[in-house]
């Protein structure tokens, strides 16, 4: 769907949502349609930029969205840069609006706009292997810092976020969708995915979930969600944050590079950065290839759940790699 069509569909609701926040908008532009419909808003009083998101209906409850804000605030207190929230006039994180053109109801939330370049754009297509290794070393250290915070943090009563456990990743209703039912798969593909899914669930059944390897994670630590500006790193887009294995976090970070030259070196840099901050056992590390495969499956489900977004090329690439990995999968335990 073209951006001008999306803007026309959601702009009236965005304008209405802004009335709930202490912002005097002078300009608003659509910047992204993915999980959410995201606008950049300029405050007419001082020219400061902000982010307004209309959150995907049905993906999170209001309690879940509020919990996201609670955790990003806790991360900020621990020294991890995140986007600071903007509260409504009556001190709430979110305001519900009706989307007249679709009949939807969406929660609108605002944060400060953070200047910078996401690492995926910073690297582009022509970055050297050494530069890519340096960036992924930094991402690994960031992941470890997140996990250090979450493993020592006690969520408040009522805290609600999804769990990327065996059921959340590979159960009958995975958080990112029933990947084996994507319409672009044939029967043989589906059989292969189902068989491998069952094999991996057997492995996960024996893999402990302790504070040393499982807890609150960002869950989408893709280089596109890490901003850099003058050496400062800011983590953005916590829409998928929840409880999960730390290895899934690392797999999510590495997956974008999986078909690029030097991928083993990228993984080594990621792990080295992580181990600079937090321990990661060799036994757990042997499961990273399996978690990369889980990430591939999850992405197929994510694409299947969002037919309104043209992900034709992404689906083809992820499908090819994931099916090949399923065909060669052997239980690591």
Regions found by a protein language model. Name each.
Residues 1, 159-206:
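Active-site catalytic-loop/activation-segment of kinase and kinase-like phosphoryl-transfer enzymes
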Residues 1-25:
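Juxta-kinase regulatory segment immediately upstream of eukaryotic protein kinase catalytic domains
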Residues 29-32:
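Protein kinase glycine-rich loop
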Residues 34-47, 51-52, 85, 198-247:
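Active-site acidic catalytic loop and adjacent metal/ATP-binding pocket
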Residues 42-154:
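ATP-binding pocket architecture of kinase catalytic cores
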Residues 134, 280-292:
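All-alpha amphipathic helical-bundle segments outside canonical DNA-binding/catalytic cores
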Residues 246-279, 295-310:
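Active-site activation/catalytic loop segments of kinase-like enzymes and analogous catalytic loops
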Residues 299-333:
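ATP/Mg2+ or Mg2+-diphosphate-binding catalytic cores
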